[in-house]
Curated annotation (Swiss-Prot):
Record-linked InterPro entries: ST7 (IPR007311)
Chaperone in keyword set: no
Keyword Membrane: yes
Subcellular location: Membrane
One annotated Gene Ontology cellular component of this protein: membrane
Membrane association type: Multi-pass membrane protein
Name the record gives this protein: Suppressor of tumorigenicity 7 protein-like
Amino acid sequence: MADGDGLGEAAIAAASPASAPGLSPSLGWRERLRAGLAGTGASLWFVAGLGLLYALRVPLRLCENLAAVTVFLNSLTPKFYVALTGTSSLISGLIFIFEWWYFHKHGTSFIEQVSVSHLRPLMGGTESSISEPGSPSNNRESETSRQNLSECKVWRNPLNLFRGAEYRRYTWVTGKEPLTYYDMNLSAQDHQTFFTCDTDFLRPSDTVMQKAWRERNPPARIKAAYQALELNNDCATAYVLLAEEEATTIVDAERLFKQALKAGETIYRRSQQCQHQSPQHEAQLRRDTNVLVYIKRRLAMCARKLGRIREAVKIMRDLMKEFPPLTMLNIHENLLESLLELQAYADVQAVLAKYDDISLPKSAAICYTAALLKTRTVSDKFSPETASRRGLSTAEINAVEAIHRAVEFNPHVPKYLLEMKSLILPPEHILKRGDSEAIAYAFFHLQHWKRIEGALHLLQCTWEGTFRMIPYPLEKGHLFYPYPSCTETADRELLPSFHHVSVYPKKEIPFFIHFTAGLCSSTAMIAFLTHQFPEIMGVFAKAVSMISRTCIEYL
């Protein structure tokens, strides 16, 4: 990766400087005094302990006691040392195994957590600096925590697959469940939000469907949908449920969605005529609007999967024009993917110009599509050797900066695009900047990167240069907010257990794991040497005890 490193440095030099961080407020004399005392406290305690030990050496008869201990150690046989070191090795090995398991499960050291949470307060440990309520540091921490909460919000995957026609077929073939209970529970909550309202009791079919969306068992949901159709043959949400969960092919799903569209349009027109009569009628209109938009969007996705891409693009454009307030559904991401399949790069740029705005939420689809378009202009002629000799051109610098911007937003995507990590079926919900979003993006967009000659090669040479600009991503970002620390936990809930969740930044192994591993290895080695060479190890043990006694007598 030497070429990639050089290109990354060139891009960083060409990039505009980041904004200077704000100046921290000066500490008062009390805070400075407290910090100084905290730094020298440990040294003072150590010196005081040595002085106390020296003063009490005669009353405590340290020399006589040490001589007695030496006689006792000299009387021990080599078998005792073998048993002692073997037991120590076993105990330290068990501690090491437990520490390693706890670190992989919770991402932190158990011994460090217990020390900080329980032992430190007992020993009188305090924070080096305490923020007063309303202080600038406290305000910054509150702002950061609020940003982390918004960044860790779970979003519905705009390109989510069909349960019956895709997820279930995967289960039939592999025997693995691609969706987690947490993910499906979020979908159930979405369905209740989109497809129900307070006036459902007025229509028996809607009452049945309200129970169906809350049902956990798929066969029970399908049975309830058929019951709703028996009560009302124009129940659009019943057709939606059957298309999502019972249809085993995209063709069957499209047929059911077309029936849902016919029923949904009729109900929507009826709700439009009555919307001003009461607040209940307005709630019905919002619900019927959600149902209609959902049906049309899924029909567009069916057309995209069946190869009728221009038809899918038309449906999506009409949806975005007819229902502009529903931008939170991220229909533009469906449109971007379809336009990339058509290789209509000018239209893709036009969509990005509207949605890649500083005031709008970002996504991996937005950032990486922008990087792909800039990469497309230089990737076919790009050569690392040539760029190292003559430097990067303006277009190449723009492409590298776009890649760095995308990687900073979601650092998990490149490994999937470069096929360094295997893909799985994307979940129904994603966490922005997390591994789940990276899987969802790469699952649909990998083919678009492969289609452009040299795009993946340029990505491979430059993407790791991003990490030099953000050495501490959890504390400070470059173009975005600091990377949220909650992504790993949320992604583990969203992604199936057979997938190895990508973690960023990579966690360092705690000190106590190294310590217990070294302790286990050293005691095992001592036990082995004592068993094989008892006389030599006995002489070594006596020498160590004599040296220790001499040092104490000297004190």
